[in-house]
């Protein structure tokens, strides 16, 4: 009997070894402009023709340099000319202009297929890309003109064919810069099909003294199976959209009392704008009633033509915000907001709030860095100071240990919005940018950084309804780390984006010397790992249609090593005939006696 038990343990250990994490290096690239600011990783996406597109912003400043460097050398366009960003004349060497950079790459080799960039206009705080059915993509971003405040070209994009496409905007004429949103369609060959303003805002003078240069934030982007485009964010003034027939539709923000005209204050209303395939307004969704301080939708994903958004909202404990039949009453912290929305008519399936709390009675913060749809669940990742609870009377399910920010993970059921688990790093200053599910149903990898130290993966384990950070860590890149971009999970592949300072540091699995940067730089790296659990909702690659397997609530039984023992729909069915022992049933540890 003892021999059989020992043999069983050996077999379980062997199975566990099969699922052990082994992230294998495939390739990497380094990217930077010669500026002391800027050089920002944004996201990696997979196009419907099976390639990758890396979206970054590179810096330019005539005092330090305007060229773009790729793998340590000046990058050239299709005609062999060295690429240069906007000729921004900085007031000092510490400033810079952020230029758009889109690069389509072969996923196996990392070889660049084409490059699209901008040489006029400054990509400001928010920018996104999303794949389209033809193998191309849509770009949306907040754009500001720093090079010349009187110039009418807000953004100029240079396609892979060398053709330049301009988006024009008439400045206010008051010597101040203005920010507006730009949307553009890039085809599969890197040609700019079209580019234009998403809408226009009024830029009012606030309280008689401050010019409102930044009236709307375009934060999230998605495209449905019909090619319609969805943009989310928040706005502080009147915003005017144009419809296909040339008529205009104006929406006025309600929550403007807290706005002082600068980017430093939090104010305004959340929105989702539905546009047709050419960028004309079809429908606009915002709250029905509100008197809170501010609310915003920060991130957006879409699955099977259902939109999911995550955001934040702040009130005073008595003020309310109403969406349809749901009324929320946020306190004076940054509370976490998330919703499920029908793409067809922008009506709500649900909208929910997780209540934030302060550390030490005064410090609070929530930053949404990513929103993932993954095997029927939503993962919200980012940074937090303070705590989160399910409602105003519940005990917090996560809380920081200091006033400094820590990595945060919240998992909810995408179907009904029920919060499933939450996790926190436990140390500052850290951040989370993505979750990777594994073949062990009770563990996940969390991608994030330890500030000024490394980009990394940390193993979290589900224990008693919480995701707890363990000791297992994989340092993907050891360097003076400042931020990350949204990574890509592609089957068993993981493509990471990091922003180290001074040089590219030590990259896991890479050989050769590090790339020296002028200051900040970008590192794009691909790994593969058999421990990664792919998303069930695999793309067909045809017209961007996703096929989802039937999902039902289950009580499937696994060993602790993650080996499936039996499938079951109920607990009674799961435990019937099951030998005594410890199992994972329905995602929870269960002792069967």
Which role does the model predict for each range below?
Residues 539-593:
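C-terminal outer-membrane/trafficking sorting elements
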Residues 3-4, 13, 302, 373, ...:
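N-terminal leader/targeting segments
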Residues 1-5, 593:
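Positively charged n-region of N-terminal signal peptides that target proteins for export
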Residues 21-538:
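A sequence-level/structural motif corresponding to short, flexible coil/turn segments enriched
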Residues 10-19:
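Hydrophobic h-region of N-terminal signal peptides that target proteins for export
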Residues 17-18, 337, 573:
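Hydrophobic alpha-helical segments
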